[in-house]
């Protein structure tokens, strides 16, 4: 039996993600150009849907397969088949089962074809009932968030909010994009409506051939509304110098106000990241930005008080972007948060040294963790008393009582971001 291109592509993506050799965004980007628009849509749904339901699917597999240790190829095929049977009504059961079996055969695991066939057929015939240890276990399984991560959010946000956040992380995020320096602006009126909260941002109703053509031509850039909110908070007056410290891949850098009479610098830690940054900026038609390689955690190669605006979009856990990158929840552990917060503080400290008197430091993350956000800023302010919190230039609804800005997937229907604006006293 022939296997559809969409399922082959989805299986390859999920296998690479499960192996730890790719993230979903990169895996999908590598296979989608070779698929038709219809197959591309199904592949996208299969990959992200299976990842969003992975713990639930694995608990179900444990119920039917017992303690049997599953080979990765078999495990991925079972997840893919079970997801279609349980969550995609439009997919015929025989297609989901038969093509999952053939995927296992294609992976040279012919001895497991009977096992895969039997498990998937049991799912179609038998009652789907899973026993839960407690309420947190139920939500952990039903929303496919590791228990330790859910407990962390319960402790920080309260149970109702933590459960709401976990549910929102499994929703398909709205499609947001923005025009680039190459955009004529005319076509955009037909492919999206203006965002209610972020100037220049447009909201689409789904990936279309027209949008993909505009993206390939460099006229639009796909970027979540919250990420664009961070970029919009960077307000620079004429002639003010700007540096984007952790710039790759260039999503926010591409929105910076550039001109031949303004110093704009963007840099990152490695040459491959700079290559990606340069390619991305060129694709967007962005010029007049100086690129620089450095390790911002160790030292920045600039004199003190060089820049009027310093942007630190710090490396982080990414827990605010789980809607777009569902596999993040399975790759994290508690030690990651401590490692990130230590790195973030070192980068922010070095960044503050090159900030001019009266200048502004914009610190942001795509994490919802207080330890990577408010706590980092609190420690920075104790070490740099010349810095003070000033309100970021964003919609009032996002501003917190502490003078920062926060977005959340469940409350705002956008990724979870944090923004702090610090001003150095003259």
Language model feature labels by segment:
Residues 1-426:
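S-adenosylmethionine
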């Amino acid at each position: 039996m022939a296997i559809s291109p969409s399922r082959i592509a989805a299986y390859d993506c999920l296998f690479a993600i499960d192996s730890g050799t790719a993230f979903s965004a990169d895996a999908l980007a590598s296979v989608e150009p070779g698929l038709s628009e219809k197959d591309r849509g199904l592949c996208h749904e299969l990959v992200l849907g299976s990842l969003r339901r992975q713990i639930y699917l694995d608990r179900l597999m444990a119920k039917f397969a017992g303690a049997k240790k599953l080979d990765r190829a078999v495990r991925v095929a079972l997840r893919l088949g079970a997801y279609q049977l349980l969550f995609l009504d439009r997919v015929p059961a025989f297609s989901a089962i038969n093509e999952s079996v053939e995927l296992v055969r294609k992976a040279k695991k012919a001895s497991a074809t009977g096992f895969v066939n039997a498990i998937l057929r049991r799912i179609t015939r038998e009652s789907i009932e899973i026993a839960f240890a407690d309420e947190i276990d139920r939500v952990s399984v039903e929303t496919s968030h590791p228990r330790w991560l859910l407990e962390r959010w319960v402790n920080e946000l309260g149970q109702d909010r933590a459960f709401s956040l976990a549910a929102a992380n499994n929703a398909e995020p709205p499609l947001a994009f923005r025009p680039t320096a190459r955009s004529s602006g005319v076509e955009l009126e037909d492919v999206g409506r203006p965002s209610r909260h972020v100037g220049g941002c447009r909201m689409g109703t789904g990936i279309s051939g027209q949008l993909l053509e505009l993206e390939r031509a460099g006229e639009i850039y796909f970027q979540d509304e919250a990420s664009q909110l961070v970029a919009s908070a960077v307000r620079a007056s004429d002639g003010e110098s700007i540096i984007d410290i952790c710039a790759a891949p260039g999503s926010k850098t591409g929105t910076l106000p550039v001109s031949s009479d303004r110093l704009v610098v963007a840099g990152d830690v490695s040459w491959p990241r700079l290559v990606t940054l340069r390619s991305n900026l060129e694709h967007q038609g962005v010029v007049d930005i100086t690129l620089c390689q450095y390790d911002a955690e160790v030292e920045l190669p600039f004199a003190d008080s060089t820049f009027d605006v310093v942007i630190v979009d710090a490396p982080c856990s990414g827990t605010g972007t789980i809607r777009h990158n569902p596999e993040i929840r399975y790759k994290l552990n508690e030690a990651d948060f401590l490692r990130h917060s230590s790195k973030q503080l070192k980068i922010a400290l070095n960044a503050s040294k090159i900030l001019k008197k009266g200048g502004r430091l914009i610190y942001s993350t795509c994490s919802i963790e207080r330890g990577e956000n408010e706590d980092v800023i609190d420690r920075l302010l104790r070490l740099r008393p010349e810095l003070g919190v000033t309100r970021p230039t964003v919609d009032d609804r996002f501003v917190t009582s502490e003078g920062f800005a926060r977005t959340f997937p469940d409350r705002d229907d956008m990724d979870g971001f944090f923004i702090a604006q610090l001003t150095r006293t003259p």
